[in-house]
Regions:
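Short aromatic-rich membrane-water interface segments that cap or initiate transmembrane helices
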Residues: 40-49, 112-128
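Membrane-interface helix-loop-helix modules in multi-pass inner-membrane proteins
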Residues: 1-73, 96, 100-108, 168-181
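Juxtamembrane/interfacial segments at transmembrane-helix boundaries in multi-pass membrane proteins
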Residues: 71-78, 85-122, 134-135, 139-143
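Transmembrane alpha-helical segments in integral membrane proteins
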Residues: 1-2, 58-64, 133-147
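Membrane-interfacial loop-to-transmembrane alpha-helix junctions, especially the N-terminal start
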Residues: 4-20, 73-82, 148-164
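Membrane-embedded translocation segments of transport machinery
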Residues: 132, 150-181
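Alpha-helical transmembrane spans of integral membrane proteins, capturing the lipid-embedded, hydrophobic core
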Residues: 19-23, 81-85, 89, 125, ...
Length: 181
């Protein structure tokens, strides 16, 4: 997409090994019952902090690569990857806002109805923007290459991108239908 090597091999290694440590930490703490008790946001605050740091490393490397690219055209696919980084960062920071009271425990910034709304805004969009937008970006690059044809309509792909960004992110409350809220 960028016709350039990754911005930094060191950042790539930190990103890779950081995720491995996060996975191991989650695999150890979750069975021990050390959780926040929120679906899709179970991990305790030190692991959430590590996720934030590793996500910033990922973004730094991605944006560095985009900046040093040799391809003049910025493919729509890259827009979807940028949206993934920005949206997941905002989602994670807002949902994982905690007030630590010990090394392993914390209080959420939210309670009651606000907690439920923030939880499902996060739960819905963490899946949507962590899984769906990178896949769409991949398809916007791969399908035209595989078909050996350009994207049917660049304008339509731009409309698709902005519609996804401005409309899909607010769909989380449907997880609360038929609940006490």
């Amino acid at each position: 997409l960028c016709k350039a090597r990754m911005f930094s091999d060191t950042l790539s290694k930190i990103h890779f090994w950081g995720w491995q440590l996060i996975i191991v930490a989650a695999a150890v703490t979750l069975p021990l019952g050390l959780t926040q008790g929120a679906e899709y946001a179970e991990l305790i605050w030190p692991i959430d902090l590590a996720i934030t740091i590793i996500w910033v490393v990922f973004g730094w490397n991605m944006f560095g690569t985009i900046i040093k690219r040799r391809e003049k055209h910025l493919y729509v696919a890259i827009w979807f990857y940028i949206a993934t980084f920005v949206t997941v960062a905002v989602l994670h920071i807002v949902r994982s806002g905690q007030l630590p009271y010990s090394f392993l425990h914390s209080y959420s910034w939210y309670s009651g109805v606000q907690d439920a709304l923030v939880q499902w805004w996060y739960g819905h969009n963490a899946v949507a923007f962590f899984l769906t937008t990178p896949y769409l970006g991949l398809m916007y690059y791969f399908m035209p290459k595989a078909a050996n044809r350009p994207v049917y309509s660049y304008r339509l792909s731009i409309i698709h991108f902005w519609a996804l960004i401005f409309l899909y992110i607010w769909a989380g409350p449907h997880h609360l239908l038929y609940t006490a809220l």
